[in-house]
From Swiss-Prot:
GO terms for biological process: modified amino acid biosynthetic process. NCBIfam families: gshA_cyan_rel, PRK13516.1. Its EC number is 6.3.2.2. Homodimer. Keywords: ATP-binding, Ligase, Nucleotide-binding. The lineage of its organism: Bacteria, Pseudomonadati, Pseudomonadota, Gammaproteobacteria, Enterobacterales. One of its GO terms (molecular function) is glutamate-cysteine ligase activity. This is Putative glutamate--cysteine ligase 2.
Length: 372
């Protein structure tokens, strides 16, 4: 199946997807009963969408097309109230975080969905292990060539996005020593990491055609790239972030990505080339392992920069664009986060260090998401 034509969308519009954890109190393990909850929510929504993800312990909530983060926040807030009430009716609770800290992957049931069942057949237990929870942000583009330029531009800041959203230090009952352990789950997938090099939309079409030769790829949705074009939406989709613990933080991260996209496509500050990616996975690893305390290596000069310092530079560079797209509040909030050394992975570890249990940690995350 060829890659569809790139759908023209309004530049810099955005959509946000959040993969949420559905848990069973009082033990706070992952539930296997998301289907009745999702069915109960769907008919009550006035905007956005709630749907299944890979396994029965996941619920995906997604905005519609939004012009700015205020619209996205309003949609999410309305959806959240419906989800919370339906969850209470089903004796379930909801929380964010990139991983559940003590669930066992062997217990996870893949949704009864043709695409997910086909993926299970292709990848086996890896799909059950992929019961992890991420935030995806779509940015509208006018054409396919702009999308490819934007994809390469945003790829330079993948470590920054990972570090700002890092919220998965625990997995399978253990401290992983990573700030974001979630992305490690995908390391065994053959399409993990950045999109293979393509300099324009025509080359991307050729790349996709060759990938379909494997008989494992039917659509762009079958590819697990960190950032991928979504021609049916007319967007570029950033997929590297853990699901934050609060809707406010999720919206702020989306605002940064929207502002960065505006800066990249308006200023065109880079001439992208394939060798830009030579140290991509090393810098990505630093962000996953150490968060904002990681070290970035410049592939062209060999210079080292603290990820926190480089993130502050990014926030400064995109400030004017943030004003243009209505995301100034997001930039200000994230700047404060970086300067104060705040991150959700650290807060999780501090809770446990202070005597909290992993069960108590999930309970706390549910309270945070509910605004308690």
């Amino acid at each position: 199946m060829p890659l569809p034509d790139f759908h023209v969308s309004e530049p810099f519009t955005l959509g946000i997807e959040l993969e949420m954890q559905v848990v069973n109190p009082p033990g706070y393990d992952l539930s296997q009963d998301s289907s009745p909850l999702i069915d109960a929510v769907k008919s009550q929504l006035t905007a956005g969408e709630v749907k299944h993800d890979i396994t029965e312990s996941m619920l995906e909530m997604a905005t519609g097309v939004c012009r700015n983060i205020d619209q996205a926040a309003a949609q999410f807030s309305a959806m959240q109230q419906v989800i919370l009430q339906a969850a209470a009716d089903h004796h379930l609770e909801i929380c964010g975080g990139g991983t559940h800290p003590f669930q066992k992957w062997q217990r996870q049931e893949v949704c009864d969905n043709a695409r997910y069942q086909r993926t299970l057949e292709n990848f086996g237990y890896l799909i059950q292990q992929a019961t992890v929870f991420g935030q995806h942000v779509h940015i509208g583009c006018a054409n396919g060539d702009d999308a490819i330029y934007l994809l390469h531009g945003l790829s330079r800041f993948v470590p920054h996005f990972i570090a700002l959203a890092a919220a998965s230090p625990y997995m399978q009952g253990s401290d992983t020593r990573f700030s974001s352990a979630r992305l490690n789950i995908f390391s065994s997938f053959p399409d993990n990491g950045p999109m293979p090099w393509a300099s324009n939309w025509q080359e991307c079409e050729g790349l996709f055609r060759r990938l379909t030769y494997t008989s494992m790829i039917d659509s762009i949705k079958d590819l697990h790239w960190d950032i991928r074009p979504s021609p049916h939406f007319g967007t570029v989709e950033v997929r590297v972030m853990d699901t934050p613990l609060t809707l406010a933080h999720a919206v702020n991260i989306a605002g940064l990505i929207q502002a960065t996209a505006h800066w990249l496509l308006t200023e065109r500050p880079f001439r992208h080339q394939e060798r830009d990616y030579l140290l991509y996975k090393f810098n990505r690893f630093q962000a996953c392992r150490y968060g904002l305390e990681g070290t970035l290596t410049d592939v062209h000069t060999g210079n080292h920069h603290l990820l926190s310092d480089d993130t502050l530079r990014l926030l400064e560079n995109v400030a004017s664009s943030a004003d243009n797209v209505g995301a100034a509040s997001a930039i200000n909030a994230l700047r404060l986060q970086v300067k104060n050394g705040l991150n959700e992975a650290r807060q999780m570890r501090e809770f446990v260090t202070d005597g909290g249990s992993l069960i108590g940690l999930v309970k706390k995350h549910c309270e945070i998401w509910a605004g308690q």
